[in-house]
UniProtKB/Swiss-Prot annotation:
Protein name stated in the entry: TBCC domain-containing protein 1
Low complexity bias spans: 140-153, 547-558
Localisation per UniProt entry: Cytoplasm, Cytoskeleton, Microtubule organizing center, Centrosome; Cytoplasm, Cytoskeleton, Spindle pole
Gene responsible for this protein: tbccd1
Regions crossing the membrane: none
Matching InterPro entries: C-CAP_CF_C-like, CAP/MinC_C, CARP_motif, TBCC1, Tubulin-bd_cofactor_C_dom
Record region (Disordered): 140-159, 547-582
Domain of life from the UniProt record: Eukaryota
A Pfam family annotated for this UniProt entry: TBCC
Record domain C-CAP/cofactor C-like: where: 305-451
């Protein structure tokens, strides 16, 4: 029987993409979800699929959520669904045709979700629930720090934003093990509950209920590397008997099924810790002298199933790293403690997390699900993404193209939101493969996720003024046809660019009409170059320019080298991580 020993673990994707890295609403407790589970089974239009109209009624009328928040969770759950790129592009096209709120509501009402899986998804939000008791462990009592009652809750919420458990596979396993009875209770039919709402001892789970658990659980059998959703894993008759399956009723004994899962549950073998310990190491980054820790880049893409493919980039410092490798296609990327770096990942990606990065620029290919920025400082991010989430970050600038409202969590300060402003030759092809369109684009309509019961901090962000807007040029030669930013710029930004271009043309004409002699031209050229070098140093652009060059080129000649011979960058070998797209 050892041949059929099952190993079941929590899937990474619902925790990584589905769980919002913030304290959930108090109405997502088991008390209210138990009521919702009974309610949806007795109302038309709620079971087995729950439409937006009924969820809005439940969320706003029963759970007292704001409509924007209700749609946020509904939309986030939809990001987890395995829809094709064509389906997502069709949905984006339909939304872009909505010109009034009534038309938008009508379109949203066409969206529905699996009811049981959505219940599990809502319960899963408890992963990042703050415990007042645990948040105070380790502090002296009385605390030497004065903390006003009004700020304490927001500080704790900002802390959970920066220390969320979305990547922590041990936390995922502990959560499932601890809350397994309640998770299964949400799947039990109302007729198997007592008058007080408690699960009866001889309760059963339908095959459909077990199938819904595949949102959270997957696994394999011993001596096999093939990973299956949990309901397909149980298609083996030997495992069915262990899990309490009855052929007569075509259902599982709840108690026996729970015992089976408790024995089978184990740590996800494709988590971030295993990736860094036993994954393949990539020599993409330079080891820069003067840095305390070595840059580390690992991947598990050679062995992990879809949704669990990871690339970890840690301590990438003081360099430019540019890649459009197939190793990045549809992977989850985590950038940890990168500083003073310029990173270009120009491939279609699955999700991206920036954690504790500072003084860096990150340019991404289209991200199918979410980009999450947490505990970062002075970081510039340029991305096309299904969702953008920012928490606990300071002085960051984000240029985005996104069909959903950017989600601003507690703890942010001095954020700047600007329109997407770059291109590379294969960008539009990558967007199509990721199911991301140019419209709708809600980059300038952020949703502030505040502490429950208090007003969100509307002063934590600003929309970039057109006078500060400059397009970003990706400094690499790549094959492809596209040479334009895929989305049109807002009118005021476009006018600002045209005005600036006109000023440059007028300045060039003034220089031409001055009729300088040869000595005057040399003097004028020297002055312009001097001012240019001063500007490079003042703005920090000199560091980026230097990092584009091979180590054999001295930084002192970087500006001249770049302006006189751009093709040199393309001639570097694929082993050279700086200044070339490999």
């Amino acid at each position: 029987m050892d041949k059929y020993t099952a190993y079941v673990w929590p899937r990474l994707e619902p925790f990584l993409v589905g769980v919002l890295p913030a304290t959930p609403p108090s109405k997502f407790s088991m008390h209210y979800l138990r009521k919702m589970a009974s309610y949806v089974r007795t109302r038309d239009g709620c079971f087995p699929r729950l439409g937006w109209q009924m969820w809005r009624h439940i969320a706003c009328g029963k759970l007292q959520l704001a409509e924007d928040l209700a749609w946020l969770y509904f939309e986030t759950f939809d990001l987890l669904m395995p829809r094709s790129a064509e389906q997502r592009l069709e949905w984006a096209e339909a939304l872009s045709q909505c010109h009034t709120q009534k038309e938008l509501d009508r379109q949203r009402c066409k969206l529905s979700v699996d009811t049981l899986q959505f219940l599990l998804f809502l319960y899963l939000q408890q992963l990042n629930r703050i415990s007042l008791r645990t948040s105070l462990i380790g502090e002296e009592w009385p605390s030497p720090r004065s903390r006003s009652p009004s700020s304490s809750s927001s500080e704790r919420d900002a802390k959970i934003s920066s220390q969320n458990k979305n990547w922590d596979v041990q936390a995922h396993l502990t959560f499932i093990q601890t809350h397994l009875p309640e998770l299964l209770e949400l799947l039990v039919e109302p007729g198997q509950l007592s008058s007080s709402g408690q699960v009866l001892r001889d309760s059963h789970l339908t095959s459909e209920a077990v199938e819904s658990l595949s949102l959270l659980l997957e696994g394999s059998v011993s001596h096999s590397r093939t990973v299956h959703p949990v309901h397909k894993l149980l298609s083996r008759s030997q495992l069915q008997s262990q899990a309490g399956f009855s052929k007569l009723s075509c259902s599982y004994s709840l108690q026996q099924f729970q015992d089976f899962l408790r024995q089978a549950l184990c740590l996800n073998p494709f988590g971030i810790s295993n990736c860094s310990q036993s994954g393949k190491k990539l020599s993409w980054a330079l080891q820069v002298e003067g840095t305390l820790k070595k840059a580390k880049i690992f991947r598990n893409t050679h062995a992990a199933p879809p949704g669990s493919r990871l690339v970890l980039m840690s301590q990438v410092c003081k360099q430019t790293l540019a890649k459009d490798s197939e190793k990045l296609n549809d992977v989850n990327i985590k950038l940890h403690r990168c500083s003073e770096a310029f990173i270009y990942l120009l491939s279609p990606l699955w999700s991206v997390t920036l954690d504790k990065c500072r003084n860096s620029t990150l340019v991404l290919g289209p991200v199918r699900t979410s980009v999450h920025i947490q505990s970062c400082e002075n970081v510039r991010v340029v991305c096309v993404a299904g969702r953008l989430t920012i928490g606990g970050s300071f002085n960051c600038t984000i240029h985005s193209l996104t069909p959903t409202r950017p989600l601003l969590l507690p703890g942010n300060a001095s954020l700047t939101l600007g329109p997407f402003h770059t291109q590379y030759p294969t960008l539009e092809d990558h967007m199509a493969s990721a199911g991301l369109a140019v419209v709708p684009n809600l980059w300038n309509q952020p949703l502030l996720f505040g502490v429950e019961g208090s007003a969100p901090d509307t002063g934590c962000y600003r929309i970039q003024p057109p006078s500060e807007f400059y397009p970003l040029v990706i400094p690499f030669q790549m094959d492809g046809d596209n040479c334009e930013i895929p989305c049109s710029l807002p009118e005021d930004f476009q006018k600002a660019l045209e005005s600036r271009e006109k000023t440059i043309e007028e300045w060039q004409k003034t220089v031409k009409d001055a009729h300088l002699n040869k000595a005057q031209r040399r003097q004028f050229q020297a002055l312009v170059e001097q001012k240019f070098h001063e500007w490079l140093l003042e703005t920090g652009q000199r560091q980026e320019l230097d990092s584009l060059l091979p180590p054999t080129i001295t930084p002192s000649s970087s500006a001249e080298h770049w302006s006189s011979n751009q093709n040199t960058l393309k001639e570097q070998t694929h082993e050279q991580p700086t200044g070339t797209v490999c």
